Amino acid sequence: MAKEKFERNKPHVNIGTVGHVDHGKTTLTAAITKYFGDFKAYDQIDGAPEEKARGITISTAHVEYETEGRHYAHVDCPGHADYVKNMITGAAQMDGAILVVNAADGPMPQTREHILLARQVGVPALVVFMNKVDQVDDEELLELVEMEIRELLSSYDFPGDDIPIIAGSALAAMEGRDPEIGENKIKELMAAVDEYIPTPERAVDQPFLMPIEDVFSISGRGTVVTGRVERGVINVGDNIEIVGIKDTTTTTCTGVEMFRKLLDRGEAGDNIGALLRGIDREAVERGQVLCKPGSVTPHTKFEAEAYILTKEEGGRHTPFFANYRPQFYFRTTDVTGTVTLPEGTEMVMPGDNLKFEVELIAPIAMEDGLRFAIREGGRTVGAGVVSKILA
């Protein structure tokens, strides 16, 4: 059969496998590619190359496959630490995830941690694959494990009663045996993923936002700010807000240019210059954002989920304590902030991941799910994500 050319007429969804070590995430990933993509052997996936995201090295394997209705990009990580880093940095954006649980063991510590991380970093939906069912003889035991998984999901505010749980064997599917627990279950799983994990809103359909990277004044024309449009569309004549650092101001975009050509609009992914009406060059600075009025608000206090780099990763060599004051790098700029550790936590070691509160000295345009780097004098010592805005 001739290879079909890749067509972008299907909606694209980013997905990943999560769950406890050795519960079968990579085997399941390989099995899905066997039926829905170009087959990748287990060791091709497991020997994932290292990548850098926000100065942090992460091993991740990427595969792609498609169902009748969708195209998927799927990420699988070899080690637990890679998952933590991946989810916190957002290196591989996940629109949904497949939680793999070994039916013989039930939920284990990393099962819990990955569900918590998915909740904290805003993975919208999970589907469960209960793996290795051929190792469980007792039908009642499977039902108990399923109940336990549902209760666990509910305890982390996922809709435990509604989440699809498919029980099968990824290995049987890989080896092409016992289709009733193998191939058929992989197909059932992907049908559930197709139906249950929502199609993400495309970046251009979201409200306009552009982090400001640079500010120029052009004599006779006014002030131009440059940056890459993160999401949405900006048209000449649109009213926009400038948010963060200083008080929010409203202006009108009187021109959009790209590669020195004038355009009537800029959209997600474009590097543009936007001409702002009646705005003084001194009134805008790097680190602010241009956005659709009312879509994003400035904040100084938030709760974050963070990963602190190890010494080997170029991070700190020593722990930090209460009232630690590093810089938090949001989008295009550093803002100093003070860390409040959770009750009972005295210190944080390099290599830890934890939840803490931050209070910044200046407000930043912020929403849940915003990623940041933690820096000391320009050196990255950690990465985090805003899990909850406090003030």
UniProtKB/Swiss-Prot annotation:
Enzyme type, top EC level: hydrolase
Record region (G4): 131-134
Region listing for G3, in residue ranges: 76-79
GO molecular function, one term: guanosine tetraphosphate binding
Amino acids binding GTP: 19-26, 76-80, 131-134
Residues annotated to bind Mg(2+): 26
Keywords tagged on the record: Cytoplasm, Elongation factor, GTP-binding, Hydrolase, Magnesium, Metal-binding, Nucleotide-binding, Protein biosynthesis
Location, primary (coarse class): cytoplasm
Gene3D superfamilies in alphabetical order: P-loop containing nucleotide triphosphate hydrolases (3.40.50.300), Translation factors (2.40.30.10)
UniProt domain tr-type G: residue ranges: 10-201
Ranges where the record places region G1: 19-26
Known catalytic reactions: GTP + H2O = GDP + phosphate + H(+)
Segments for region (G2): 55-59
Stretch list, region G5: 169-171
EC numbers: 3.6.5.3
Localization (cell): Cytoplasm
Gene Ontology CC terms: cytoplasm
Pfam families per UniProt: GTP_EFTU, GTP_EFTU_D2, GTP_EFTU_D3
NCBIfam families in the cross-refs: EF-Tu (TIGR00485), PRK00049.1 (NF000766), PRK12735.1 (NF009372), PRK12736.1 (NF009373), small_GTP (TIGR00231)
Family: Belongs to the TRAFAC class translation factor GTPase superfamily. Classic translation factor GTPase family. EF-Tu/EF-1A subfamily.
Cited PANTHER family: ELONGATION FACTOR TU, MITOCHONDRIAL, ELONGATION FACTOR TU-RELATED
Known function: GTP hydrolase that promotes the GTP-dependent binding of aminoacyl-tRNA to the A-site of ribosomes during protein biosynthesis.
Assembly notes: Monomer.
Protein name, as recorded: Elongation factor Tu
Organism: Ruegeria sp. (strain TM1040)
Encoding gene, per UniProt annotation: tuf1
